[in-house]
From Swiss-Prot:
This is Deoxyribonuclease-1. It catalyses: Endonucleolytic cleavage to 5'-phosphodinucleotide and 5'-phosphooligonucleotide end-products. Its EC number is 3.1.21.1. N-glycosylated. Keywords: Actin-binding, Apoptosis, Calcium, Cytoplasmic vesicle, Disulfide bond, Endonuclease, Glycoprotein, Hydrolase, Nuclease, Nucleus, Secreted, Signal.
Amino acid sequence: MARLVLELLAAALLLRVAATLRISAFNIRTFGDSKMSNQTVAGFIVSILVQYDITLVQEVRDADLSSVKKLVSQLNSASSYPYSFLSSIPLGRNSYKEQYVFIYRSDIVSVLESYYYDDGCESCGTDIFSREPFIVKFSSPTTQLDEFVIVPLHAEPSSAPAEINALTDVYTDVINKWETNNIFFMGDFNADCSYVTAEQWPSIRLRSLSSCEWLIPDSADTTVTSTDCAYDRIVACGSALRQAVEYGSATVNNFQETLRIQNKDALAISDHFPVEVTLKAR
């Protein structure tokens, strides 16, 4: 009888762990065919992404999605769970373009809706974002909050304060469009060091929005290089979403330490570490 109770407790614990949702944002520097053709680097990327249920991948340079498809195929081979992806179109003001790609476990989450934030006339030079957010609403039946929105941003370093500030307008736009403020803002905001200084933070509206909480602090280091900068951030908005976040789960994944690799090998993967957060099980 005691053994049965222990087995049931173990099964319940496994179910609870499986029902939480681990989400990350990862700028994989210049992700494309060249990176995926390196078997060692590709293997490391798979070993990082397989830890997550949703990953926002940034700096994807893969217009035909061949490297993304290869990555997801390798993820599906490495995991006992199925992964799918949703990609934006290539975004950028000139010939240099990047994609936002969401890679997610399709057995526990699904995409409900998506749209591109309209930030003004690109050809006129009056748009705000270098890479406008590709906004996605997810369904997550296993977590306390069963629907939430992710707004991605890879900010242009030279205009990072203005782009982060404009996320408040995106916040309002999502509320008007989908009638929810349960929103994650995440990505490489370039939100520290010389790109966003201490003097600039007071004028950034998202920083002081009472409904939002900055989960990755200014003291964090999200860089693989010798710099110490909190470029990559996760911001949780909406009371239901903030309450659904597992306490203490927001962190930086230092894969150089967890994979026990040298700095040069870590830099072959990216110059950024992923940032992550976990949603509580239902």
